[in-house]
Amino acid sequence: VSSPLSVADFDYALPPELIAQHPSPERGGSRLLHLDTQGRLHDRMFADLAGQLRANDLLVFNDTRVIKARLAGHKASGGKVEVLVERIVEADRALAHVRASKSPGPGTVLRLADRFDVTVLGRAGALFDLRFPGDVLDLLQAHGATPLPPYITHAAETEDDERYQTVYARAPGAVAAPTAGLHFDEAMMQRLEDVGVARAFVTLHVGAGTFKPVQVEKLADHVMHAEWYTVPQATADAVARAHAAGGRVIAVGTTSARALESAAAQLQGDGQAQPQTPQTPQPPQALRAAQGDTQLFITPGYRFQVLDGLVTNFHLPQSTLLMMISAMAGMDPIRRAYAHAVAERYRFFSYGDAMLIESPVAPALASSHSAAPGPAAV
C-alpha cells in the first residue's frame, strides 16, 4: 500500500542563481524542455514550439491582466503599511493583504501612495476588506506598482510593467502573471496559426496564494486557495472540436489548466477535484461554459478530464503547481526533468524558461478519440 503523499515528495534543490531575475531579451527567446508521452526529455528553444504541435491541436490561454496591485502607505499614527490587493469585489471595494506592525482594525484609515485614504471595513479570513475613495482599478493603475513575485529581488521597473504581462492580457484582475504565456509574442501566435493550431481563452485571476508553499505535511490536509475563473462556451466548444478532430488540448499555464479542469469538475456537480479512486466509467460529457471560485487541488492520482498537455514554467519546490504537473506527467518523470533542468542550467520561475509536457494518457472527456501513444508514466 503506498503511503499518502507528503510535501517532502515535491522538494528539490535549486541553486539560487538559476532563479531568473529578468526576462530574456526577447519574449520567445527562452529555452523549452520537452517531456514527451514516453517520458523522454528533449532540450529545445521556445521558438520551436510550433514544430511540436500539429493541425487541430488547441492551445488554451489565460487572458487575465495583472493589475498594479501593490501600494505603500501609512496609518494615521505614522506606522508603515503595505497593501496588496487580492480581489476587487465592487468598483470601490477590494479584499487585500495588509502588512503592518499591528493589524489595522475596522474603521482604521490608511493613507496610500501619499494621495488617497482607504478605510478598513473588516476582515475576510486573512484578507482585509477595504473601501477606496473611487474606482479601485483606476486608483491602482495611477498609483500602484506591478506586484512582482517574492523571489524577484528588484523593485518593479518600467520593463516589468510590459514584460510581466502577456501580449493577449485583456481582463484585469490578477496579482500574478500566468507566466507560461509570457513567452508568446505576436510572431509566435502567427506561426501557430499558420500550422493550423487553434486557440481559445479562459480567464483565471491569479491570486497571491499561487506563491504559497504547502504548509502542512500531508497533501490531504492542505486547504487550496480560491481563485475566480470563467470558461466561455466558445472555449468549451473549441475543446470538443479539437478532440473530435483528433487534436490535443494543451493548456498554456497551470492557471488555464485549473480553469478547464474546474469547468469539467462542475459537470460532475461539485466543482471540486474528483475522489482519487477508480470510478465507474461514465459516458463522456461535453465541456460546458462555467465560472465561479475554484479550489480545485490537482495532485498525483487525479485523472485529467480535458487536457492532453501543458506549456508551463518551472515551479517552486513544494508548491501546488509542482504537484499539478506531477499529476499530469508522473512524479518520477517530473523529478528527472527538474534534475535535468538544474544540471543544464535552465532559468527558473516566472521570468525563466518553459516546459512542454505531453500527457502519457488521454483525458477522460476525450475518450472518443484514441489515447496518446506510449506507456503511462507512474
Language-model-detected regions and their locations in the chain:
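Surface-exposed, charge/polar-rich loops and edge strands
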Residues: V1-V378
